[in-house]
């Protein structure tokens, strides 16, 4: 009986130790508003902290060095190889679909979409034009070489090329542009560094599918149970409003997952 009790205790302790294993999350060192090691802030860092708490596991950030100016979707270098090699358990804010963001990485898989991100339209206070189709022949500031810039060309806007989200938003104050079309999370980071009172989100603007993406957690494909647990935690955090509050704290415009997202077909619909 004593040996049986000892065995049960050992099993219980082993189970407890396993449950307490840290949740390792790969985060880029300089990637505001998602993660910033120096300030200890960022939407992905806050999300990771909340998910780990829901799972009853301590959070272990795995910081990955990167350039300091990566703020656009097109420029992000997600540390997918580190995830595949087991350096961490999950990445957050990975855009779908997997055939694009995880191309050449069959050992990885995306979880459920838990929020959407898009190019957002900023204008001056009282602006009533609220769709891309109303921007033909209108001066619009946009960061060069982005999907947003291509979309503006399709609708016939007068493009005012900028080198950063902050510069695009600044062109409203200098009257070089009537609008700025900026990747939403990048706008949040730029406005946190340099507030632009002249740049306000355009009321009633709905991002077109061509300029919208859904964001997912990414795990190793074999970690099905972990992926399901993370999806469940993210659904609960969204239902409670915690994700929305974390996004707002970083200046990220909040969107529930979109029904339709970027594709070449959706881009053609802008014409």
Each language-model region and where it sits:
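Sec/Tat signal peptide C-region and signal peptidase I cleavage site
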Residues: 15-19
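A ligand-binding cleft/hinge motif common to bilobed small-molecule-binding domains
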Residues: 84, 92-104, 178-211
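Extended ligand-binding regions for polar small-molecule ligands
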Residues: 42-55, 125-126, 133-134, 138-139, ...
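Periplasmic-binding protein-like
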Residues: 28-31, 113-123, 192-235, 253-271
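Bacterial N-terminal signal peptides
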Residues: 5-14
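Extracytoplasmic small-molecule ligand-binding "clamshell" domains
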Residues: 20-94
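Ligand-binding clefts/hinges and TM-proximal coupling segments of bilobed small-molecule sensing domains
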Residues: 58, 150-160, 233-271
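Bilobed "Venus flytrap"/periplasmic-binding protein-like clamshell domains
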Residues: 31-32, 38-58, 117-169, 184-186
């Amino acid at each position: 009986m004593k040996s049986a009790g000892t065995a049960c205790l050992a099993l219980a302790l082993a189970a407890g130790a396993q449950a307490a294993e840290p949740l390792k999350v790969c985060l880029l060192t300089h990637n505001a508003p998602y993660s910033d090691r120096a300030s200890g802030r960022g939407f992905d860092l806050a999300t990771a902290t909340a998910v780990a708490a829901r799972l009853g596991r301590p959070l272990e950030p795995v910081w990955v060095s990167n350039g300091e100016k990566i703020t656009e979707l097109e420029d992000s270098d997600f540390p997918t190889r580190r995830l595949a090699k087991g350096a961490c358990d999950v990445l957050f804010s990975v855009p779908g679909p997997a055939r694009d963001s995880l191309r050449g990485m069959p050992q990885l898989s995306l979880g459920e979409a838990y929020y959407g991100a898009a190019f957002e339209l900023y204008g001056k206070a009282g602006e009533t034009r609220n769709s891309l189709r109303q921007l033909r022949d209108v001066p619009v500031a946009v960061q060069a070489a982005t999907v947003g810039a291509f979309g503006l060309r399709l609708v016939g806007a007068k493009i005012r090329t900028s080198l950063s989200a902050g510069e695009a938003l600044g062109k409203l104050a200098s009257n070089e542009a009537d609008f700025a079309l900026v990747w939403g999370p990048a706008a949040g980071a730029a406005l946190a560094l340099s507030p632009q009172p002249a740049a306000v989100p355009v009321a009633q603007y709905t991002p077109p599918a061509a300029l919208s993406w859904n964001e997912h957690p990414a795990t190793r494909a074999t970690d099905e149970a972990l992926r399901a647990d993370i999806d469940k935690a993210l659904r609960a955090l969204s239902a409670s409003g915690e994700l929305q509050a974390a996004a707002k704290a970083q200046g990220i415009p909040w969107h529930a997952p979109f029904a339709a997202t970027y594709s070449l077909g959706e881009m053609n619909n802008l014409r």
